[in-house]
């Protein structure tokens, strides 16, 4: 009888340890996904701002490669859905993604202003930049005014506020997610003691 009881205890303990390890692994992955989303947003901002200042096509190309090829923001949200993240957490990241998509419009405008000022024909522009329609006011600006406007809109208070509208939901996601996963981990830890 004691051998059966001891065997059952060992199986229960092993199962509890695995549950704790799984909870810790989930917490680590969720945390990394939140970091990845914030980093992707920062990367896009950095590349768009570098292009606005240096006019180097390398930065423009890196920006659009992240959006169209690497797609970190979309991949993070897809992975969180696969992990059955709670709706509240997914909605926060969806809000951050929507706000990020809206900021892309400001960045496209800046890029288009630069490409226009530098005399690039539309067929030599990245599709997303070529298809951005500048306002009549933007079109009337001189070369120098276009370059200045392109820089200004990438560094003004409105841009910073828009950037905060991306990072704030990500920070809230991380707080809620950390609390939830810490609670899951604590339950798993208690099962091993």
In which residue ranges do the predicted regions lie?
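N-terminal alpha-helical signal peptides/signal-anchor transmembrane segments
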Residues: 26-52, 70-74, 93, 100-103, ...
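Amphipathic alpha-helical segments and their boundaries
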Residues: 2-43, 83-99, 191-192
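Juxtamembrane amphipathic/coiled-coil helical coupling segments that flank
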Residues: 11-24, 45, 114, 135-193
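Short secondary-structure boundary segments
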Residues: 2-18, 41-74
């Amino acid at each position: 009888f004691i051998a059966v009881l001891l065997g059952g205890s060992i199986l229960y303990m092993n199962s509890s340890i695995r549950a704790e390890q799984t909870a810790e692994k989930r917490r680590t992955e969720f945390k990394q996904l939140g970091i990845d989303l914030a980093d992707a947003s920062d990367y896009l901002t950095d590349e768009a701002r570098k292009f606005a200042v240096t006019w180097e096509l390398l930065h423009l190309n890196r920006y659009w490669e992240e959006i169209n090829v690497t797609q970190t923001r979309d991949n993070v949200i897809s992975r969180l859905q696969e992990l059955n993240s709670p709706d509240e957490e997914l909605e926060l990241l969806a809000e951050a993604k929507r706000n990020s998509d809206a900021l892309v419009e400001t960045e496209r405008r800046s890029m288009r202003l630069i490409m226009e000022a530098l005399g690039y024909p539309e067929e030599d522009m990245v599709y997303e930049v070529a298809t951005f329609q500048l306002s009549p006011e933007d079109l009337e600006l001189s070369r120098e005014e276009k370059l200045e406007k392109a820089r200004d809109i990438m560094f003004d208070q409105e841009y910073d506020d828009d950037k905060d509208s991306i990072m704030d939901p990500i920070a809230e996601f991380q707080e809620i997610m950390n609390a939830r996963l810490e609670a899951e981990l604590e339950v798993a830890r208690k099962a091993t003691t």
